[in-house]
Amino acid sequence: MQGVKFLNGKYMAKSVKKYIEENEARFLEEWFSLIRIPSVSADPTRKTDMVACAERWKHLLLEAGADEARVMPSSGNPLVYAEKRVGFDAPTVLIYGHYDVMPAEPLDLWKSDPFEPEVRDGHVFARGADDDKGQSMIQLKAFEYMVREGHLRHNVKFILEGEEEIGSPSLNAFLQEHRELLACDVILVSDTSMLAPDLPSLTTGLRGLAYWEIEVTGPNRDLHSGHFGGAVANPINVLCSLLARMTDE
């Protein structure tokens, strides 16, 4: 990206490791404080929890060094916006994440409370520990490190939504309404995966979602198969053919 200055990789690795070691207990507690909030977007009874989680993210973003952070309304669950300004001419990175999680049911399959983080063999078990409170926390702490150590060379914006797990029904309208606020040079998505635990991966693209309702209409009365079979298309056969051809081989 034009205008970005990169620091020495070996120095950064040592410095980051030291920062993590010095702040590990705090990092974990802040992460766990988010996990403990049952921000299940598919459950309409969790509206209060959704707002509480958004407010918690706002607080953590300000603590990490954002110039401003706010919880913004939408037609559904609120979104969290924050930014750190370095310079008018500096490139801007927009970091996307989501604070909502999937339902934890069936609860009898869990060995521990899904909303009370439990560490077993060096791994954290809880709903949202990974998707997406874990990845978003990594981005937040990387941002915090860059700010506090004086390494930040570009403007940073955060946007966290609360409906990703239900298809982001309110996101498009929000983006259109606030397109100037969210203007950026590049977007970093905090909701991807690694090929293996010891193999960090750079994801350059994700598949989206698309929904259709298809209606196939045929004759308005029963037709004798001996007279019309094969000559008049059966709506079921037509629909099967359509579905089979929707995949691009």
Describe the function of each predicted region.
Residues 11-107:
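N-terminal helical capping/dimerization or prosegment-like subdomains
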Residues 25, 36, 62-63, 148-151, ...:
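Generic secondary-structure signature for well-ordered alpha-helical cores
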Residues 90-157:
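Active-site metal-coordination/substrate-binding segment of hydrolases
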Residues 130-205:
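Acidic/histidine-rich catalytic neighborhood of metal-dependent amide-processing enzymes
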Residues 172, 180-249:
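Midchain, well-structured core segments that form catalytic/ion-binding scaffolds
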